[in-house]
Amino acid sequence: MRKTLLALLPAVVFLLGTVTAQAEETSRSFTDDLGRSVSIPAKPKRIVTLHDIDLTIPLIELGVTPVGSHGRMGTDGKPYLRSSAILTGVDFDNSDIAYIGSINADLEAIVALKPDLILTEPDRPTPIEKLEQIAPTVAIDNTKDGAPHIYKMLAELTGTEERLAVLDRRYRAQIDALKASVDTGTITVSVFQPLNGKISVYHTYRALGRVLRDAGFRFPAIIHAIPEGDRIEISAERLPELDADIIFDPYRSDTGTSPQAEIDMMEAVMPGFCDFLKACRNDRYILLPREEAISNSYAALSLMVSAVQSHLTVRPSTEK
């Protein structure tokens, strides 16, 4: 009997090793931006995302469609993924993505989707403690190096590094083309928008800001002083500090707001604001759709490269 057991021992050890290896293949450890070590599926199949612009759109660009996503509620009472229809062609109404709420996530809706991975951000109002009771939950900080960090994390989570490399290669080629046509190092640029009676200014305004920085444009000192990933609000009296050769003002386009409405809001902040800005007096105050400018997606980056290049390339002149 003992000889028989000894003879079977190698086979038992082999089987145990196989089971262990299979378990390791189906899950792995991942450290998120809160420093938490999370056991996640090696190949997640049912992902729920808690932010449309920062998480859902990048996932779609990487070729991964989540089963559920945070979204916004339109004036028609229908949910939508902000900027997604413009940038990816995908929205709730033409995909299998389920709407799981806007500001506060609908936990019951998430449970019903049977996710194997939940993606959130550190500042989302739905507590991670509640989410991780449903499925492994990873927090990705959108203020930590912006889009490059988000995409790197998502690609690692979903095994889509090759797709990310292609997207990034295309963007780098577009930046090189922009720099070849515009002497970016000699041009100062500024990006801001009116908000709640003040002027909102980011260190790097999402896709638009990243394009401007990657292309080598210069910024006013007040913008340089803002910590990376942060923003400030200033009073109208400091508006001249934001002057530059070119000013970009992203207007809210998803709600049907017009560029003129953005100008009216600036007038409300400071009547006759254009008189205080050299860029505005020289017809270099450019309004761009916020839906494209504020996204973290590569599609938005491409659109912003084209927009910046079209406004700044040399034009024919009638002056002698």
What do these predicted regions represent?
Residues A7-G17:
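Bacterial N-terminal signal peptides
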Residues T18-A23:
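Sec/Tat signal peptide C-region and signal peptidase I cleavage site
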Residues R46-L50, D54-L59, V166-I222, G229:
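Basic- and aromatic-lined ligand-binding clefts that recognize polyanionic substrates
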Residues I53-L107:
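A short, structured surface patch at a secondary-structure boundary
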Residues H70, P127-A165, R172, S258-L287:
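Charged, glycine-enriched surface loops/patches
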Residues M73-P79, D141-M153, V189-V211, D254-A261, ...:
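Extracytoplasmic ligand-binding site segments that recognize negatively charged/polar headgroups
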Residues L107, V111-T120, P136, L239, ...:
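Proline-aspartate-enriched helix->loop->beta-strand connector
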Residues S181, D245-K320:
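Structured C-terminal subdomain patch of bacterial secreted/periplasmic proteins
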